UniProtKB/Swiss-Prot annotation:
The keyword Nucleotidyltransferase does not apply. This is Small ribosomal subunit protein uS7m. GO terms for biological process: translation. NCBIfam families: rpsG_bact. Keywords: Mitochondrion, Ribonucleoprotein, Ribosomal protein, RNA-binding, rRNA-binding. The lineage of its organism: Eukaryota, Viridiplantae, Streptophyta, Embryophyta, Marchantiophyta. PANTHER family: RIBOSOMAL PROTEIN S7 (PTHR11205). It comes from the Eukaryota. It comes from Marchantia polymorpha (Common liverwort). The gene is RPS7.
Length: 230
């Protein structure tokens, strides 16, 4: 049998070529798996650091890594079940604060800012109570809209829903924190937000003044309230 014949040579060459391609493919798959594992580990470490901030701010406890079926829900950015003593409304309030603080879809960054703010508020008492008091002191009960009537633009006051009241209060506090930071790049946003929440809980600050100005404007234009059609 001639091993160096044309047919035998083609068979050996094709088998060696298949082995080469399969080995290269396995190397690529292994490299991709290692990269995904590294990215997953870094993401887990980042999430764990944020959870440490929040747990320290609210309870002073460190979270333990879940196993089994709960491991998939642990990586969810909106899961706050690891914090004891929070009801559904308080969890939704924290989520709303994170979502309104978010810019360009960078939720991890906004979550870090909020949790660092809680970390700074921890020495002053219950963080959730301070946040709720600040929102209660800032949220408006009415707003003013421009309505064109007989060729004239009127400012028509109207009562707003509770959900929008909370949204406006959080938005005003974040805007006030951003104003505090203007021209002072050495100060972080979480420091400014911490100062604004602390002042708002004491019925002071820029956001509280904005709420009072809006109420005065609505009081001055209450004679046009019957024009409200929405």
């Amino acid at each position: 049998m001639n091993l160096f014949g044309k047919s035998n040579f083609n068979c050996v060459f094709s088998s060696s070529l298949d082995w080469f391609h399969s080995s290269r493919l396995s190397e690529k798959v292994g490299t991709k798996k290692n990269r995904i594992c590294r990215e997953t580990e870094s993401f887990y470490a980042l999430c764990l650091s944020h959870r440490r901030y929040l747990c320290y701010a609210l309870e002073g406890l460190l979270p333990s890594r879940p196993r089994g079926r709960r491991a998939s829900t642990y990586n969810c950015s909106d899961n706050l079940g690891y914090i004891r003593g929070l009801n559904g409304k308080q969890k939704q309030l924290i989520k709303k604060l994170v979502h309104i603080c978010m810019i360009d879809g960078k939720k991890t960054r906004s979550r870090a800012i909020v949790y660092k703010t809680f970390h700074r508020l921890a020495p002053h008492g219950d963080v959730i109570k301070l946040l709720v008091n600040a929102i209660e002191n800032v949220k408006p009960i009415c707003e003013v809209k421009k309505v064109r009537i007989s060729g004239t633009t009127r400012l028509v006051p109207s009562i707003i829903a509770t959900n929008r009241q909370e949204t406006l209060a959080i938005r005003w506090m974040l805007e006030s924190a951003a104003k505090r930071r203007m021209g002072k790049k050495s100060i972080s946003l979480d420091q400014c937000l911490y100062a604004e929440i602390l002042e708002a809980s004491q019925k002071m600050g820029i956001a509280r003044k904005k709420r009072d100005d809006l109420h005065k404007l609505a009081e001055a234009n209450r004679s046009f309230s019957h024009y409200r059609w929405w």
